[in-house]
UniProtKB/Swiss-Prot annotation:
It comes from Bacillus cereus (strain ZK / E33L). This is Aspartate--tRNA(Asp/Asn) ligase. The record marks G84 as: Important for tRNA non-discrimination. The keyword Ion transport does not apply. L-aspartate binds at E176, R222, H450, R491.
Length: 591
């Protein structure tokens, strides 16, 4: 078999007159009665191959048996297309290959999905036949971008003198965060490894080990409830460095991301990226990962509401809650009463009891609650919300967390429905100064907002013992277009501070020693100040490739129920395997 001389998508007019050897899949076959045209596809694109009895009767006879997705080896001569046959939508649209020989390397059954970017297959069918789904050009291009992003990051970190170091996949189960995936030990009866949720502790120990600059394209595992931008196993760009300040880490990441955007996407983004404190993000956008491609910020009306005539507003403020509103400019005529009812049901999903609304008309405010506002109050509302005729004003009065969640989500919905978002924009944002801890009323304890190894502000260390809820974290999240790309922080590197953190989280001394004794001891051997960040590679590629589902950026992903439709994992194992591990199943009965 002759070697391939050209990729299908790379045969151009420069090759006219040459004999070429092509190998690929049949995208489409057209029989025009005496002539057969085949679109031959490989990962670079498509080229048209013509089977003509005047060129080769033998090749034409073989072509008559060929169907879609057959794998072919074609030998032929490159010729220019006639003037009326030129297809400028194809890179190879000015030429075609006159086949002299063809060899069927493999036949194919009729495929259960259409191998094309606009396939009509459901996602379940695509995942079951993932090897066919991956043949679609849009899928290959996504993974080519993933490769380019990873290569750019590796090259950048190499120039910054980072070492790529692999950390263990079989490790120790620790509390906090999501549930671990557990792996039973055959050698140690009744004991389990855990698959890492992140390399957090090991990368900190590498800093203790004097490596100073580490990175890893790390596989991570979390047994958590899934959604469109979550998977049980995922890849993160894990980075840690000693002796750097927060500003130095953020500056380095900005330089890395601007290079990624330019090299992998061909887009210039300017640095430094904007920075916003967590409290400001929540106040202005109702989100810790705001999409800043459009405005429509939340406005706090609590002071006004406390003295207005609308009891729903006043009682919310009196009970310690707040009232906030968003002004959907020019949207009054676009939302009927039925549409607003749908918005009301939408905010209820986020805990809101309802959605108050007003439309601004030339002669004043109109809507179910307009009667509660006199002329003076109406003017204050209009001025505060910068409202003009044609605007739609939407209000939520509730607990602060409910107001933020519901209006933050409503803002995003309106941004999409009103087409306010410029999809060509890439808006990066740092969210900084996070709370160190979050209180869970159900569990009656504090949890780490990021993780238990995040350094508090120096002046807040003592608050861990006196007022933990007030302690701020030296933490930062990188946000792109309303998605959290990753998070990082400066780390605790002193034993006494780490012990205070564990105590604030409700760990006894014994529990802390049992779970993290190796880390606490390491801190006694001259641990340097250090910090880092972890960026979600899958999510970054999803955004750059314009995909809406994380599964499209992972070669063999899991479904929303954490199963693989291709291999049918997870699956039962043989009784002998369980016996070898000294395990016995005790399954709960379905109710």
């Amino acid at each position: 078999m002759a070697e391939r001389t050209h990729a299908c998508g790379k045969v151009t007019v420069e090759a006219v007159g040459q004999t070429v050897q092509l190998k690929g899949w049949v995208q489409k076959r057209r029989d025009l009665g005496g002539l057969i045209f085949i679109d031959l596809r490989d990962r670079t694109g498509i080229v048209q191959v013509v089977f003509n009895p005047e060129t080769s009767k033998e090749a034409l006879e073989v072509a008559e048996t060929i169907r879609s997705e057959y794998v072919l080896h074609v030998e032929g001569t490159v010729v220019e297309r006639g003037e009326g046959a030129i297809n400028d939508n194809m890179a190879t649209g000015r030429i075609e290959v006159q086949a002299t020989k063809v060899n069927v390397l493999n036949a194919a059954k009729t495929t259960p999905i259409i191998i094309a970017d606009d396939t009509d297959a459901s996602e379940d069918v695509r995942l079951k036949y993932r090897y066919l789904d991956l043949r679609r050009p849009v899928m290959f291009n996504t993974f080519k971008m993933r490769h380019d992003v990873t290569k750019t990051i590796r090259n950048f970190l190499d120039t910054e003198e980072f070492l790529e170091v692999e950390t263990p996949i079989l490790t120790k189960s620790t509390p906090e965060g999501a549930r671990d995936y557990l792996v039973p030990s055959r050698v140690h009866d009744g004991e389990f490894y855990a698959l890492p949720q992140s390399p957090q502790l090991f990368k900190q120990l590498l800093m203790v080990g004097g490596f100073e600059r580490y990175y890893q394209v790390a596989r991570c595992f979390r047994d958590e409830d899934l959604r469109a931008d979550r998977q049980p196993e995922f890849t993160q760009i894990d980075i840690e460095a000693s002796f750097l300040t927060q500003d130095e880490i953020l500056d380095m990441m900005e330089r890395m991301m601007t290079k990624v955007m330019k090299d992998a996407k061909g887009v210039e983004v300017s640095a430094p990226f904007p920075r916003m404190k967590y409290a400001d993000a929540m106040a202005r956008y109702g989100s810790d990962k705001p999409d800043t491609r459009f405005e429509m910020e939340l406005t706090d009306l609590s002071e006004f509401a406390a003295g207005c005539g609308f009891k729903v507003f006043t009682s919310a403020v009196e009970s310690g809650g707040q009232v906030k509103a968003i002004n959907a400019k020019g949207a009054a005529s676009k939302y009927s009463r039925k549409d607003i009812d749908a918005l009301t049901e939408f905010v209820k999903v986020y805990g809101a009891k309802g959605l108050a609304w007003l439309k601004v008309e030339e002669d004043g405010l109109k809507g179910p609650i307009a009667k509660f506002f006199g002329e003076e109050d109406a003017n204050v509302l209009m001025n505060t919300l910068e409202a003009t005729a044609g605007d739609l004003l939407l209000f939520v009065a509730d607990k602060k967390s409910v107001v933020a969640d519901s209006l933050g989500a409503l803002r995003l919905r309106l941004g999409k429905e009103l087409e306010l978002i410029d999809e060509s924009k890439f808006n990066f944002l740092w969210v900084t100064d996070w709370p160190l801890l979050e209180y869970d009323e159900d569990a009656d304890r504090y949890f780490a907002a990021h993780h238990p190894f995040t350094m508090p502000f120096r002046e807040d260390v003592e608050l861990l013992e006196t007022a933990p809820e007030k302690a701020r974290a030296q933490a930062y999240d990188l946000v792109l277009n309303g998605y959290e790309l990753g998070g990082g922080s400066l780390r605790i590197y002193e034993r006494d501070v780490q012990e205070k953190m564990f105590k604030a989280l409700g760990f006894s001394q014994e529990d802390a020693q049992e779970q993290f004794g190796f880390l606490l001891e390491a801190f006694e051997y001259g641990t340097p100040p250090h910090g880092g960040i972890a960026l979600g590679l899958d999510r970054l590629v999803m955004l750059l490739a314009g995909r809406t589902n994380l599964r499209d950026t992972i070669a063999f992903p899991k479904t929303a129920s954490a199963s693989c439709l291709l291999t049918e994992a997870p699956s039962p194992v043989a009784e002998a395997q369980l016996e070898e591990l000294n395990l016995k199943l005790s399954l709960k009965e379905e109710k």
